[in-house]
């Protein structure tokens, strides 16, 4: 519907944008002309003025650079911080540089100064750089010239130089030059009533591109700068709201559909300072650049449309009243604009030449009207003393203030005749008045009003007090004014102190006063008289300290916002703070992700399969996402879910009317792209069940079905096939139902067929859309399912390069980290020093190096001088182990951390350079003749981007990609005797010689034994010939154990649980009379029996202190070396035992190992024979005899499986024992705990273990639910058995307990359900099919 409306305007004018530089004033200097002319040297003496002069020979007119007239320059009468030199250029100039020189041949020069500028000689603005009021370094002698090129040019008629420091052995002395060029622009003054319209020639304007530029200045916080709208709902509005710039744009919405095009972006702050601000709007379709005072914001509009359709006109300065909602409740702009350009049209020039046609321009004029207000700027040690009228019965004061601080002293004044004093404070962002009255019973009167008054906006305070009455009004809100009728006597004093109190700094008796005010004040009225601040500046009358009159230099330190990733910025006068709660990031500027970058990283922290938050680009812009990490294999699977994993039925669609199935993932496409890019392999399962529904229409037809992947590209192949081949899996394998076709479904059979398989070309994944178009015929039907995206491996985590010699290095493009930079990597080396990386600028640099065997250094310079942070380790770092280095630098601080050593932090100066400007290439491994790095570096990430060390090493001579020796650092992760195996990308754990399984050999392998079941493992002991000895010299230890016929030692450990005693747990027989047995006696006590010969009776170890047949899992660990036996049971301390001295020390010729029951020919010990029937019932796990794991050999296909014989069917179980893993963190300190940030991402049901659709939508929690229900049902059944036995305990008695409603019920179950509604729920639950 909307598209049809838009089609009617296809004949509208298509605008060609001339160039982007038209956005500047048409008379501004060309970008090809250097703006660097001296502006002071040709000026007459009358163009100079100053705060004072030592004499006429030191007049300001002599302050010209390299001139020797008069006394050789300007010097004031006093050398203090209230002196200044001012120059009037006669008209506005564009200023690009400033230079200073001391007074000729003297000891008078300025070492530091500020530059203020203005259009009118009033309302001065200090030059800003790097977010601070800039202090320029001055001279070191009287003759040399020090020049500074401005970081950004300024436009002004007046320049004022304010010395901050000077030569301590002399006085202030100054000669100066300012460089720039002429500037002129058309200016229009708006009075707040009239608007400036630009009407379109054809009454309509349809644009794909727009470039709109203007400059404005105002003292109002609200006002519309420009507005245009169309009848289709399109509009564009640029306005001020609370002194911030707001751009609102709508390229089209659909009131009957989901398209909502409204977009609003806010920029800037404190724009009501009556200084010029430049705005540039560049639009290309939905892509917008909004630039305010050199700070650019890029964004995309909402909706789906690209053209802006405006009708009739676009207006500047306000919205003409039309009765529409857009024209009401919006103030017109009051202030000045210049250089208004709309798509190449100079609006201000047309207005000046009266070429805009009839309009309601109102009282527009072409010169800027300046405000009458005079601001005062206070710092932490300021005060302003204003005289008042003495002994008045009415105390009346009003003023406006703006600040960021929540507290500060606004006003203090003594009453006459010792009646007390009045104090007005800002306390916790409220204005409070405290009256101390010494002549009344109520000595203290406190009232307060307002809230949130430290927001940087102008706020008005009016306070009036007279006898027995006082009223406080904030921002003119009379309805909220606070009044008091407390007893009060008033007689005004002769002095009013604003912003601070003179005695507050010199007299401890006033220590209860609030800290001095930091901010600006204006429109100060005392006793109903407006204070003339220019007279106060000349100290006639009044006085001040450390204030600047006619300037408000308040800075919004949250604009631009240095808090990243949605962190909330708050500020005081001289600093800002970032609140990172619920962002997923931490640090001073919310720069660092609290999550690991991949599932691979979680695996190496000892975590197990579960849902985790990952952040693939770390500190980058993508943000965290929640995925399932499957860690049951050597390589970790990362699984991303979507909302279409249940089978979807599609009917009634044809090639002209397709069924479009959109998949919504639990992550954005950019986040998923980051996962697939770093993965080694990705796959996604697709399945198409069909009945008379063709799929790809092979071999020669146009596909009826296709899928859309990354970058919205269509793909015409199906699961199991490859890109560019219009086939299904059966077409590749040549086993389709009908060999004439390449897909089973293309045969168009009436019977159900299926085409399914994995899509594995990761550059095309994920599947975002599936289109089906052949289900509209009679009997046609298709069932579609798409599994989750599964990716394996992490190329970034193991991305490494070996540095073969100290003179070698890899180079990359310049590191971009002007205001925020983070660097992290792993290294290992054997040398004590070397440069990890370095990047240089003209004077700036950044470097990380190993300074010594125990020191890592992070050094940089952003223009304030070199800074170095060093972390010292108590142990050597050149130990050929992996060590992690993390360095960060932002506008607030810099930090360095090595491994888990304490982080070292260095705060940034509150004023100074903040941007790191680098130009050279980034060198990794050393450069510039320095001591290079020798060793290995991996996983090098800079601002969230992993540098591909491997690829760069492959194309650089003398380098080797990858690193070896991972097991030296990570071998300890292989638990329970697992062996660490080196791999090109990382390592793996070989669990073949252990009784455990899993990635880190920490997963129990066990089985449940039913009564009568048994397992036998037969030992082999072939003779070892002399010839075999040499060939088997390198055989593993477990093979040697197998070959050894006699054993001088055994290591046995296992876990078991049972409720039945007696039983045999483990028995080892021999070809002689030797045996070993572990059994549970009838009392439940554990007994170990050893018979090695030499004794009449077997040696017994009885553990009598507890019942082991209690159904709980128990761990048994037995170690024998000759005659010494060590037994460790559960968590109890190990206990030592000794075989009799007559006993042999060898276990001769071991034959078989039995679990559960002994089935052995020949003579068996009587105790064993007595306890051998009926056999063990329960669970056994972790069974290991030396290097033999019999249960694992039975349940897994290993080399030892041929030695195993089983009676009965083993059911695998871990016997309720928890996997042996690293100790888990608490939920309070675990950053990837599931409860954290659950609202940030959607969860969709799927089975992560299988990686394909769950048909009935049952997720992994069903196992837990099913287990709980099973326990509940078991409890209910036990209770019913008890009740039945109780009810039938009387013999010869007959009771009937028929359920009500049995007559009408069809069955007994129905009768029970009719009678007991709660039972219905139980039956329903039991009938559910749970996936466990």
UniProtKB/Swiss-Prot annotation:
This is Contactin-associated protein-like 2. Residues 187-368, 373-552, 799-963, 1023-1214 form the Laminin G-like domain. GO terms for cellular component: axolemma; axon; axon initial segment; cell surface; cerebellar granule cell to Purkinje cell synapse; dendrite; early endosome; excitatory synapse. Disruption phenotype: Mutants don't show difference of Ranvier nodes length and width compared to wild-type littermates. Double mutants CNTNAP1 and CNTNAP2 have wider Ranvier nodes. It is a single-pass type I membrane protein. In sciatic nerve predominantly found at the juxtaparanodal regions (at protein level). Keywords: Cell adhesion, Cell junction, Cell projection, Disulfide bond, EGF-like domain, Glycoprotein, Membrane, Phosphoprotein, Repeat, Signal, Transmembrane, Transmembrane helix. The keyword Glycoprotein applies. Residues 28-1262 are extracellular. GO terms for biological process: action potential initiation; associative learning; axonogenesis; behavioral response to pain; cell adhesion; cell morphogenesis; cell population proliferation; central nervous system myelination. The chain crosses the membrane at residues 1263-1283. Residues 1-27 form the signal peptide. Glycans are attached at residues 289, 346, 363, 379, 436, 507, 546, 630, 735, 1117, 1199. It comes from Mus musculus (Mouse). InterPro entries: ConA-like_dom_sf, EGF-like_dom, FA58C, Fibrinogen-like_C, Fibrinogen_a/b/g_C_dom, Galactose-bd-like_sf, Laminin_G, Neurexin-like.
């Amino acid at each position: 519907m909307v598209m049809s409306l838009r089609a009617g305007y296809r004949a509208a004018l298509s605008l060609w944008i001339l160039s982007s530089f038209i956005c500047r004033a048409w008379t501004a200097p060309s970008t090809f002309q250097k703006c660097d002319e001296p502006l002071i040297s040709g000026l007459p003496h009358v163009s100079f003025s100053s705060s004072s002069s030592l004499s006429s020979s030191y007049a300001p007119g002599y302050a010209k650079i390299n001139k020797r007239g008069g006394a050789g320059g300007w010097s004031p009468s006093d050398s203090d911080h209230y002196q200044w030199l001012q120059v009037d250029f006669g008209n506005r100039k564009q200023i690009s540089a400033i230079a200073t020189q001391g007074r000729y041949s003297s000891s008078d020069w300025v070492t530091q100064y500020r530059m203020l500028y203005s259009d009118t000689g009033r309302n001065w603005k200090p030059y800003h750089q790097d977010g601070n009021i800039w202090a320029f370094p001055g001279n070191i002698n009287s003759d040399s010239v020090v020049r500074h090129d401005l970081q950004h040019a300024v436009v002004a008629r007046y320049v004022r130089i304010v010395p901050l420091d000077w030569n301590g052995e002399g006085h202030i002395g100054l000669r100066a030059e300012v460089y720039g060029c002429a500037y002129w622009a058309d200016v229009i003054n708006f009075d707040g009533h009239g608007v400036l319209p630009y009407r379109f020639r054809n009454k309509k304007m349809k644009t794909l591109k727009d470039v709109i530029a203007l400059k404005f200045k105002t003292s109002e916080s609200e006002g519309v700068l420009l507005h245009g709208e169309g009848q289709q709902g399109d509009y564009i509005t640029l306005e001020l709201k609370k002194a911030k710039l707001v751009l609102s744009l709508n390229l089209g919405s659909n009131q009957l559909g989901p398209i909502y095009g409204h977009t609003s972006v806010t920029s800037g702050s404190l724009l009501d300072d009556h200084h010029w601000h430049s705005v540039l709007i560049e639009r290309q379709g939905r892509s917008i650049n909004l630039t305010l005072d050199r700070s650019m914001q890029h964004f995309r509009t909402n909706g789906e449309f690209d053209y802006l359709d405006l009708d009739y006109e676009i207006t500047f300065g306000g919205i003409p009243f039309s009765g529409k909602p857009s024209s009401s409740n919006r103030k017109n702009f009051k202030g000045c604009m210049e250089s208004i350009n709309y798509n190449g049209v100079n609006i201000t020039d047309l207005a000046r030449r009266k070429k805009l046609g009839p309009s309601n321009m109102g009282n527009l004029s072409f010169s800027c009207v300046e405000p009458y207000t005079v601001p005062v700027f206070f710092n932490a040690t300021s005060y302003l003393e204003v005289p008042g009228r003495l002994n008045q019965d009415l105390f009346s004061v009003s003023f406006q203030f703006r600040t960021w601080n929540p507290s500060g002293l606004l006003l203090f004044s003594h009453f006459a005749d010792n009646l007390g004093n009045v104090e007005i404070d800002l306390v916790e962002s409220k204005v409070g008045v405290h009256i101390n009255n010494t002549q009344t019973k109520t000595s203290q009167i406190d009232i307060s009003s307002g809230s949130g008054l430290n927001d940087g906006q102008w706020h008005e305070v009016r306070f009036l007090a007279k006898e027995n009455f006082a009223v406080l009004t904030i921002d003119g809100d009379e309805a909220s004014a606070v009044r008091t009728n407390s007893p009060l006597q008033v007689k005004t004093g002769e002095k009013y102190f604003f912003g601070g109190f003179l005695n507050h700094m010199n007299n401890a008796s006033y220590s209860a006063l609030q800290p001095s005010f930091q901010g600006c004040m204006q429109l100060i009225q005392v006793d109903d008289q407006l204070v003339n601040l220019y007279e106060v500046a000349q100290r006639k009358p009044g006085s001040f300290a450390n204030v600047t009159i006619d300037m408000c230099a308040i800075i919004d330190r949250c604009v631009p916002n240095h808090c990243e990733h949605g962190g909330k910025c708050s500020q005081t006068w001289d600093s800002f703070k970032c609140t990172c709660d619920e962002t997923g990031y931490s640090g001073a500027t919310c720069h660092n992700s609290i999550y690991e970058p991949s599932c691979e990283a979680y695996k190496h922290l000892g975590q197990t399969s579960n849902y985790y938050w990952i952040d693939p680009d770390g500190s980058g812009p993508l943000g965290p996402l929640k995925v399932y990490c499957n860690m049951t294999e050597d390589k970790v699977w990362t699984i991303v879910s979507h909302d279409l994993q249940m089978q979807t039925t599609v009917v009634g669609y044809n090639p002209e009317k397709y069924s479009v199935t959109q998949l919504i993932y639990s992550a954005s496409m950019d986040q998923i792209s980051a996962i697939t890019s770093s993965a080694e392999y990705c796959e996604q399962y697709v399945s198409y069940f069909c009945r008379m529904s063709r799929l790809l229409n092979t071999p020669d037809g146009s596909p009826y079905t296709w899928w859309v992947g990354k970058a919205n590209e269509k793909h015409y192949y199906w699961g199991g096939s490859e890109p560019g081949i219009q086939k299904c899996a059966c077409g590749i394998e040549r086993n389709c139902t009908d060999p004439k076709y390449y897909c089973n479904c293309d045969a168009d059979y009436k019977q159900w067929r299926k085409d399914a398989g994995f899509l594995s070309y990761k550059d095309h994944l994920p599947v975002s859309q599936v289109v089906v178009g052949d289900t509209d015929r009679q009997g046609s039907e298709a069932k579609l399912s798409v599994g989750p995206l599964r990716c394996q491996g992490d190329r970034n985590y193991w991305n490494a390069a070996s540095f073969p010699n100290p003179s070698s290095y890899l180079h990359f493009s310049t590191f971009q980290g002007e205001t925020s930079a983070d660097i992290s990597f792993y290294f290992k080396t054997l040398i004590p020093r070397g440069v990890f990386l370095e990047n240089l600028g003209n004077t700036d640099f950044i470097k990380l190096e190993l300074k010594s065997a125990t020191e890592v250094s992070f050094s940089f310079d952003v223009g304030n001088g070199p800074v170095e942070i060093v972390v010292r380790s108590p142990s050597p770092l050149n130990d050929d182990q992996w060590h992690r280095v993390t360095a960060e630098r932002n506008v607030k601080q810099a930090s360095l951390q090595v491994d888990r050593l304490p982080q070292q932090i260095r705060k940034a100066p509150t004023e100074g350079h903040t941007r790191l400007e680098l130009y050279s290439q980034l060198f990794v491994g050393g450069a510039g003749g320095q001591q290079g790095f020798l060793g290995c570096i991996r996983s090098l990430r800079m601002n969230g981007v992993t540098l591909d060390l491997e690829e760069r090493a492959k194309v650089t001579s003398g380098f080797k990609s990858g690193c070896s020796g991972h097991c030296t650092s990570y071998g300890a992760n292989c638990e329970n005797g697992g062996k660490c195996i080196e791999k090109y990308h990382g390592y793996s754990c070989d669990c073949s010689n252990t009784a455990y399984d899993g990635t880190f050999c920490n997963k129990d392998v066990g089985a449940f034994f039913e009564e009568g079941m048994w397992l036998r493992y037969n030992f082999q002991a072939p003779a070892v010939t002399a010839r075999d000895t040499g060939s088997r010299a390198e055989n593993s230890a477990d093979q040697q154990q197998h070959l050894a016929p006699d054993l001088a030692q055994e290591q046995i450990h296992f876990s078991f649980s049972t409720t039945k005693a007696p039983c045999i747990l483990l028995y080892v027989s021999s070809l002689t009379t030797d045996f070993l047995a572990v059994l549970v006696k009838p009392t439940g006590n554990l007994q170990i029996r050893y018979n090695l010969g030499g004794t009449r009776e077997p040696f017994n170890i009885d553990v009598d202190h507890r019942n082991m047949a209690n159904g709980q899992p128990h761990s048994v660990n037995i170690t024998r070396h000759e005659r010494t036996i060590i037994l460790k049971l559960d968590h109890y301390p190990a206990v030592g035992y000794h075989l009799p001295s007559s006993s042999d020390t060898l276990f001769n010729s071991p034959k078989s190992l039995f679990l559960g029951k002994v089935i052995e020919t020949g003579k068996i010990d009587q105790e064993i024979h007595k306890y051998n029937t009926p056999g063990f019932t329960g669970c056994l796990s972790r069974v290991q005899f030396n290097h033999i794991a019999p249960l694992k050999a039975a349940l897994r296909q290993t080399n030892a499986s041929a030695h195993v014989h089983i009676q009965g069917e083993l059911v695998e179980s871990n016997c309720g024992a928890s996997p042996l893993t690293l100790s888990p963190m608490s939920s309070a300190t675990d950053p990837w705990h599931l409860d954290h940030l659950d609202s940030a991402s959607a969860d969709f049901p799927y089975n992560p273990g299988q990686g394909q659709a769950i048909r009935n939508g049952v997720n992994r929690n069903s196992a837990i639910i099913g287990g709980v229900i099973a326990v509940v049902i078991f409890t209910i059944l036990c209770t019913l058995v008890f009740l039945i036995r109780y009810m039938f305990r009387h013999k010869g008695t007959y009771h009937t307990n028929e359920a009500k409603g049995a007559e009408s019920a069809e069955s007994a179950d129905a009768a029970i359900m009719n009678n007991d509604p709660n039972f219905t729920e139980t039956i329903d639950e039991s009938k559910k099919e749970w996936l466990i």
